[in-house]
Amino acid sequence: MRRGQVQKMKRTGSTSLGLVFLTAMLISMRTPIQTVYADEEPITLRVCSWEEYIDLGGWDADEAIALDNGSVIFGERPLYEEFEDWYRETYGREVRVEYSCFGTNEDLYNQLNMGDTYDLVCPSEYMIMKLIAEDKLLPYSQDFYDESDENNYYINNVSPYIRETLETNEIHGESWSKYAAGYMWGITGVLYNPEYVTEEEASTWEIFGNPKFNRQVTLKDNVRDSYFAALGILKADELTDEDFIRSADYHEHLADMMNDVSPETIEAAQNLLDDLMDNVYSLETDSGKADMITGKIVANYQWSGDAVYAMDQADADDFELKFAVPKESTNLWFDGWVMLKSGINGSRDRQHAAEAFVNFVSRTDNAVRNMYYIGYTSSIAGNEEDDTVYEYMKWCYGAGEDDEDIIEYPVGYFFSGDNSDKNYMLETVSSQIGRQLYSQYPPEDIMNRTAVMRYFDDDANKAINQMWINVRCFDINDVPTGVWMAILAVMLVMVWMFYRKSKSKRT
């Protein structure tokens, strides 16, 4: 959780609680009440998302965020509770949110298969693809995409970059945007300690096999992330070839290469990962951040949001960590809101409430609350009339009056779709390159070499999962014949002894 971790980078200022609550009241009054024609029974909306992935409120008074555009951001109560009030005030109908959490995408999938029922869930891109392929998701309504509706905060505020990503990627001929609304997004890379690791050394997936850092680096303890890193190493020469990078169909070929699950590639990846296991300190899911902060390791495969958290923590302890993006390619990931057919079950009321919930958390002030609370980057950018998200980025990373070595950092690709847009040319200190800003809003040249990991079919999933079992445990195919013969001999002796013992009892 990111709250309170970036104080050194924030602009100073004071805000009275009266202004905070006045602003909150004005926000809640800025839209007219509409009526949903349905029964008057309260709607129960069942939402399931990641743990600590939404603002739970309870902010201290001095945490109020005063932005240069006049907005004041303050988290008093959990957002899902505030949604209930907003829905009643906006649509004249009671809704009750049952909010629960899951630990991993696979946990969520298993919960659904075991009979748990939810209306709205927030899995990662590959699980969204799997649920689409299995016909478990309900498309968003046409009303949800109506840009003339001022309450449709999602379609009016989503980043052009995220919107294009969702619209241009397909599964079974249908775009992701038909079923998914972006929530948080990021990339993967290498969190490193610059005292021991150079930027060049950290800017390649090959760092995990670099003997210089034997037992000082960690990989992720999940097959998709580690397989991606392995592909980056196996295909490094082609991925960094200038002719390949300049080719007209570069992005299509890049995606194909970073999703190669041919038997030959899986076998090569297993052999490589076997070698990497001799060099890494461990496989980890969450402990890598703490290990970097305590100095147990010097480099760590990391998601951009967790990298920001670790850098914030290190700053608080007066030492520096940095984030590098491998030159070969990086994984673009996102988590998105999707509606389940089994939960909505044909109910117009529940679908309307689910879509309204997505819109509510996509309001720019709420997007800022979530980013501040959890430390990840929202898919919401705002628009020409509402620059709250951009102002929050300035509040976090903008250069102060006394700062030196100031640079222009373009982020137009995310906010307007034009990276040369002068309205989104952030003035920041040069030290932010490779730091928090760089992690949350990577430069466009890095985004150009991202690839989304696709949903793999059952056969491919089975193959790479078996590969991962072989890597994490052992591959029975690698056991020498002599060992198998010794095991067989021991088993035969045990059977013979059991037979002798049974025979002696009968006599």
Tell what function each PLM region has:
Residues 207-223:
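Short loop->beta-strand "edge-of-pocket" segments that line small-molecule binding or catalytic clefts
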Residues 339-441, 492-493:
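Mature extracytoplasmic/periplasmic domains
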Residues 219, 226-230, 238-322:
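Ligand-binding pocket segment of bilobal, Venus flytrap-like solute-binding proteins
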Residues 29-40:
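Sec-dependent signal peptide cleavage junction
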Residues 146-152, 270-274, 317-341:
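Periplasmic-binding protein-like
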Residues 416-507:
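Conserved C-terminal helix/tail region of periplasmic/extracytoplasmic solute-binding proteins
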Residues 94, 103-109, 129-185, 199-206:
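Hinge/lid segment of periplasmic solute-binding proteins
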Residues 40-130, 134:
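Early extracytoplasmic/lumenal segment of secretory-pathway proteins
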